[in-house]
Amino acid sequence: MARLVLELLAAALLLRVAATLRISAFNIRTFGDSKMSNQTVAGFIVSILVQYDITLVQEVRDADLSSVKKLVSQLNSASSYPYSFLSSIPLGRNSYKEQYVFIYRSDIVSVLESYYYDDGCESCGTDIFSREPFIVKFSSPTTQLDEFVIVPLHAEPSSAPAEINALTDVYTDVINKWETNNIFFMGDFNADCSYVTAEQWPSIRLRSLSSCEWLIPDSADTTVTSTDCAYDRIVACGSALRQAVEYGSATVNNFQETLRIQNKDALAISDHFPVEVTLKAR
């Protein structure tokens, strides 16, 4: 009888762990065919992404999605769970373009809706974002909050304060469009060091929005290089979403330490570490 109770407790614990949702944002520097053709680097990327249920991948340079498809195929081979992806179109003001790609476990989450934030006339030079957010609403039946929105941003370093500030307008736009403020803002905001200084933070509206909480602090280091900068951030908005976040789960994944690799090998993967957060099980 005691053994049965222990087995049931173990099964319940496994179910609870499986029902939480681990989400990350990862700028994989210049992700494309060249990176995926390196078997060692590709293997490391798979070993990082397989830890997550949703990953926002940034700096994807893969217009035909061949490297993304290869990555997801390798993820599906490495995991006992199925992964799918949703990609934006290539975004950028000139010939240099990047994609936002969401890679997610399709057995526990699904995409409900998506749209591109309209930030003004690109050809006129009056748009705000270098890479406008590709906004996605997810369904997550296993977590306390069963629907939430992710707004991605890879900010242009030279205009990072203005782009982060404009996320408040995106916040309002999502509320008007989908009638929810349960929103994650995440990505490489370039939100520290010389790109966003201490003097600039007071004028950034998202920083002081009472409904939002900055989960990755200014003291964090999200860089693989010798710099110490909190470029990559996760911001949780909406009371239901903030309450659904597992306490203490927001962190930086230092894969150089967890994979026990040298700095040069870590830099072959990216110059950024992923940032992550976990949603509580239902």
UniProtKB/Swiss-Prot annotation:
GO cellular component terms, semicolon-separated: extracellular region; nuclear envelope; nucleus; zymogen granule
Subcellular compartments: Secreted; Zymogen granule; Nucleus envelope
Function: Serum endocuclease secreted into body fluids by a wide variety of exocrine and endocrine organs. Expressed by non-hematopoietic tissues and preferentially cleaves protein-free DNA. Among other functions, seems to be involved in cell death by apoptosis. Binds specifically to G-actin and blocks actin polymerization.
Primary localization: secreted
Ranges in coiled-coil conformation: none
Keywords noted in UniProt: Actin-binding, Apoptosis, Calcium, Cytoplasmic vesicle, Disulfide bond, Endonuclease, Glycoprotein, Hydrolase, Nuclease, Nucleus, Secreted, Signal
Stated name of the protein: Deoxyribonuclease-1
Native source species: Gallus gallus
Processing after translation: N-glycosylated.
Family recorded in the similarity comment: Belongs to the DNase I family.
Manner of cofactor binding, per the entry note: Divalent metal cations. Prefers Ca(2+) or Mg(2+).
Signal peptide positions (record): 1-20
